[in-house]
Amino acid sequence: MNTLRTVALMTVLTLLLVWAGGMMGGRGGALFALIMAAVMNLGSYWFSDKIVIAMYRGREVSSGPLFSVVQELCLRNALPMPKVYILPQATPNAFATGRNPKHAAVAATEGILQVLSREELMGVMAHEMSHVRHRDILIGSIAATIAGAISYLAHMAQWAALFGGFGGRDDDDGNPLGLLLLIIFAPLAAMLVQMAISRSREYAADRGGAALCGNPHYLANALRKLEMANSRQPMPKVNEATAHMFIVNPLRGGGLKSLFSTHPPVDERIRRLENMTVL
């Protein structure tokens, strides 16, 4: 059921991109957006891990406490060993990326190594490895890529509105209402779809992570510390299209950022974990 729901949401996201292309350029724009969606999905499949790691200037490691924890989890649960990266960020956070369990990467900030105990770090990495195990990372990467393209088209539409038209519509008068809907509705709709995909999979990864590390309290304690640290010191220069990939929401502030978070409430995640029996 969760797989069918995710497929449906990804279809909605792709159709939204096609609609945005149609609003910008008529039938030709819709066809271009459809081709772009196919190319972007293929690109996300093959290169999403490299793109996201490069975006946050990740450094691959083959030793140290983070590598040791990931290696222990993989050996204990017979999982393929992913590449391990450290991000030069003081704010504690982590994410996973890649196209499948054999071609995956996990990344954590320098700050997380200063804040969490080894058990808590194991809980966080178990959560990320659960994403890897269930291929959530590929779905999240594709969703982030398409949502970013929709936001880009909406930004272009703002300029089109300023200069009086679509520039490539089949009619001369254009469609001001369609342009307005694209500017306002498309980014919001893309964010809502991302939120729906991310929230259900975060709860599942929490459960899976607890199973992988053997103690749900490891992750519960880590989430409590991570949420507090990110509230006090938000991560700078976060790309909104990739925010859903992190274990806790790196975007902070009021308005839409808090109302339409791609992450479930941390308090609820902690409550569910603490109510789990030791596995």
UniProtKB/Swiss-Prot annotation:
It comes from Syntrophotalea carbinolica (strain DSM 2380 / NBRC 103641 / GraBd1) (Pelobacter carbinolicus). The chain crosses the membrane at residues 6-26, 28-48, 137-157, 177-197. NCBIfam families: PRK03001.1. Its EC number is 3.4.24.-. The lineage of its organism: Bacteria, Pseudomonadati, Thermodesulfobacteriota, Desulfuromonadia, Desulfuromonadales. Binds 1 zinc ion per subunit. It is a multi-pass membrane protein. It is found in: Cell inner membrane. This is Protease HtpX homolog.
